């Protein structure tokens, strides 16, 4: 049973718009959330995904504000996180409201080249933006919590987002170190979580106004840092999964009071059909849970109309960046390996070398070298030794993508497996082959047109090359429904 703190109810009663009912709000908070997912278009189109899942008993209701988002129904005993299609990265389990901020940031401009996600983990919005960018440009994804950085990296890897650079900093430093560096910034701020009560019945059990006010001070510092990191003419989206004015409108008003006409709020009333139901007088979206039968959420968008003074002197460039640009000979060798042995044409990005490692960075990353320490950049392509190149799992997941079928026609060594074989592979087991043949060496294991990873073809079996940390204890095969 949902427990709503009386102090919270009293506060919300003063803020709830006149056309909305408090009884409807409480009733909505007491209902379970509708299940929702976002199709990962880096790997599969929404239409192809629906055709894949409809025979398995899924039904799809479009989410109005996300072209690739759907409310779904299916056998609720199934643990979707274990589903083969989820492990493959074909979809992300994402609450519908949380799809709003990336949509707001990329509408109407979908051509941002340098984007910052200031508070990224676990990665739903990061990977949504990576798909909207179609793995072009540079997406810097920051997370302050060390344990959550690992989760973020795992999701970026699973979804095949190749143009991300991960950082692990307090978000308040970005205005100083990466001053006016980004075309667009998303800050989905840490918050009181009042909108999440439908999935966490105890979220508001110990709600207090003092804690709200304390959090709002952190949010003000974060939005100011994000604004300073934004280029003039760029767009910033600020969002929370909370409902009170202190953490929402109050934070946006603080920024405008601080920077005056450099802050221009953009109305979101036309973002999607029905957006006006949640639009505030300022043009923000204040999504109460009863409006769209979703989590509570807040989204604001602004344009930075002019440059503003930096608050700190420009930091010195950091030395000893461990990567160097590949020589023409090195670049040609790694390109030939991917093309000839794997049937994959490498994108026209920066090929970088560190010791015997070959990496692929976005071109846009050049401007960021030495300005900040990055946990992870781009994609590790391969290791090189006297025996030649050995491709890395993440490169196959990120770069093979939807091109595998075409790649096979171009000479790629691809082995298509059944669903049962795919399950065995993801659980770390070797796959016996029905007929023995000539050993083919390294091959790409593929299921349903999307890569699972690498294996060594020994003639009578596929020797599993899946990294040990990605081996699953359980893989769910969703059965066809009559």
From Swiss-Prot:
Keywords: Cytoplasm, Methyltransferase, RNA-binding, rRNA processing, S-adenosyl-L-methionine, Transferase. The gene is rsmF. GO terms for biological process: rRNA base methylation. The active site is at 241 (nucleophile). It holds the Pfam family YebU_pre-PUA_dom. One of its GO terms (cellular component) is cytoplasm. S-adenosyl-L-methionine binds at residues 119-125, 143, 170, 188. GO terms for molecular function: RNA binding; rRNA (cytosine-C5-)-methyltransferase activity. This is Ribosomal RNA small subunit methyltransferase F. It comes from the Bacteria. CDD domains: AdoMet_MTases. Coiled coil: none annotated. The lineage of its organism: Bacteria, Pseudomonadati, Pseudomonadota, Gammaproteobacteria, Alteromonadales. It is found in: Cytoplasm. InterPro entries: Methyltr_RsmF_N (IPR031341), MeTrfase_RsmB-F_NOP2_cat (IPR049560), MeTrfase_RsmB-F_NOP2_dom (IPR001678), Nol1_Nop2_Fmu_2 (IPR027391), Nop2p (IPR011023), RCMT (IPR023267), rRNA_ssu_MeTfrase_F (IPR023545), SAM-dependent_MTases_sf (IPR029063). Specifically methylates the cytosine at position 1407 (m5C1407) of 16S rRNA. It catalyses: cytidine(1407) in 16S rRNA + S-adenosyl-L-methionine = 5-methylcytidine(1407) in 16S rRNA + S-adenosyl-L-homocysteine + H(+). Belongs to the class I-like SAM-binding methyltransferase superfamily. RsmB/NOP family. Its EC number is 2.1.1.178. Its main location: cytoplasm.
């Amino acid at each position: 049973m949902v427990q709503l703190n009386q102090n919270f109810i009293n506060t919300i009663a003063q803020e709830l718009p006149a056309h909305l009912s408090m009884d409807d709000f409480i009733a909505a908070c007491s209902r379970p959330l509708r299940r929702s997912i976002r199709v990962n278009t880096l790997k599969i189109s929404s239409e192809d995904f629906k055709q894949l899942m409809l025979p398995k008993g899924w039904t799809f209701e479009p989410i109005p504000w996300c072209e690739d988002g759907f409310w779904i129904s299916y056998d609720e005993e199934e643990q979707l996180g274990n589903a083969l299609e989820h492990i493959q990265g074909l979809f992300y389990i994402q609450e519908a409201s949380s799809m709003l901020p990336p949509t707001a940031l990329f509408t109407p401009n979908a051509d941002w080249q340098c984007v910052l996600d200031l508070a990224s983990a676990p990665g739903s919005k990061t990977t949504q933006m990576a798909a909207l960018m179609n793995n072009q440009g540079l997406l810097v994804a920051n997370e302050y919590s060390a344990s959550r950085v690992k989760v973020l990296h795992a999701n970026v890897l699973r979804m095949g987002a190749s143009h991300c650079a991960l950082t692990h900093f307090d978000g308040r430093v970005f205005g100083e170190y990466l001053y006016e560096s980004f075309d667009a910034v998303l800050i989905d701020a840490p918050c009181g979580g009042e909108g999440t009560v439908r999935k966490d019945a105890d979220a508001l059990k110990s709600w207090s106004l003092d804690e709200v006010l304390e959090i709002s001070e952190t949010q003000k510092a974060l939005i100011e840092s994000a604004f300073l990191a934004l280029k003039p003419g760029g767009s910033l989206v600020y969002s929370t999964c909370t409902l009170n004015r202190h953490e929402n409108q109050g934070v946006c008003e603080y920024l405008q009071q601080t920077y005056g006409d450099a802050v221009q709020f953009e109305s979101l009333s036309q973002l999607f059909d029905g957006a006006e139901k949640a639009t505030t007088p300022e043009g923000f979206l204040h999504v109460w849970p009863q409006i769209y039968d979703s989590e509570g959420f807040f989204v604001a968008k602004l344009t930075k109309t002019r440059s503003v003074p930096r608050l700190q002197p420009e930091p010195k460039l950091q030395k000893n960046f461990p990567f160097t640009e590949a020589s023409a000979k090195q670049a040609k060798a790694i390109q030939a390996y991917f093309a000839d042995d794997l049937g994959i044409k490498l994108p026209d990005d920066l090929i970088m070398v560190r010791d015997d490692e070959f990496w692929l960075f976005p071109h846009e990353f050049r401007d960021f070298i030495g300005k900040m320490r990055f946990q992870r950049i781009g994609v590790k392509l391969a290791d090189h030794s006297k025996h030649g190149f050995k491709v890395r799992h993440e490169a196959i997941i990120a770069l093979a993508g939807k091109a595998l079928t075409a790649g096979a026609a171009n000479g790629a060594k691809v082995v298509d497996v059944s669903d049962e074989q795919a399950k065995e592979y993801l659980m770390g087991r070797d796959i016996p082959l029905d007929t023995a043949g000539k050993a083919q060496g390294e091959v790409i294991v593929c299921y349903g047109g999307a890569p699972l990873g690498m294996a060594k073809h020994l003639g009578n079996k596929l020797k599993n090359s899946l990294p040990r940390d990605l081996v699953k204890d359980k893989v769910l095969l969703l059965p066809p429904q009559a």
